[in-house]
C-alpha cells in the first residue's frame, strides 16, 4: 500500500475512533445531565436535594460551569399592572464571557425561594431577554408558577443552541400577586445557572 494512501486510511481510522469516543462521552454526559434537562413547557419542579445532588455530580464534568446569583435584600419591588415585580440580570462566569460566541448545549436555571417567603405566597417566574409586561391572568409564555415552600427548587428554563453572548443578556423576572406579603427590601430567591457548552465535545474531552 502506498504510504500516502496508508496515511490517509490511518487518519480516517483515528477520526472514526475519535468520533465514536465523542459520541460515547456525550451520551454518558446526557445521562448524567438528565436530572436537569427539563423543559419549561412541563412547568417542572423538583426537590432541592435532587438538584444539589445533580450539581455535585456535574461539577466533575470538564467544561461544565455553575454559578449563583442572589436576589439581594436591597431589592425593591415595583408595581406594574397590579403586580409586584422584580428582575435581575444573570451573572455569567468570566471564563465564559471570554468566549462570547461559544455555543451552549444546555442551560438550566434553578430558582429557590427564600425560606422567609410564606408558603402560601405565589410567584410566577420567567427568563427572557426583554421585559414582557404581565396583565391580569396573563404572563409571558415561559413563566412558571412557583410557591414559597422551603426546600423546593424550580427549573424554569432549558435553552439549548444559543451563545454565551445571548445568555449574558438574559434577565430573571419574578411576578408576585400580593405586594404586601413580600414588601420592600425583602430577600426573594436564589438562582443557580447550570451550563454545558460545546467545548465538552472537542478533542480534549475524548477518553484515552
Swiss-Prot record:
Keywords: Capsid protein, Ribonucleoprotein, RNA-binding, T=3 icosahedral capsid protein, Viral nucleoprotein, Virion. It is found in: Virion. GO terms for cellular component: ribonucleoprotein complex; T=3 icosahedral viral capsid; viral nucleocapsid. Residues 1-23 are annotated as: Disordered. The keyword Transmembrane helix does not apply. Residues 1-12 have a biased composition (Basic and acidic residues). The keyword Zinc-finger does not apply. GO terms for molecular function: RNA binding. Residues 13-22 have a biased composition (Basic residues). Capsid protein self-assembles to form a quasi spherical capsid, about 25-35 nm. This is Capsid protein. The lineage of its organism: Viruses, Riboviria, Orthornavirae, Kitrinoviricota, Alsuviricetes.
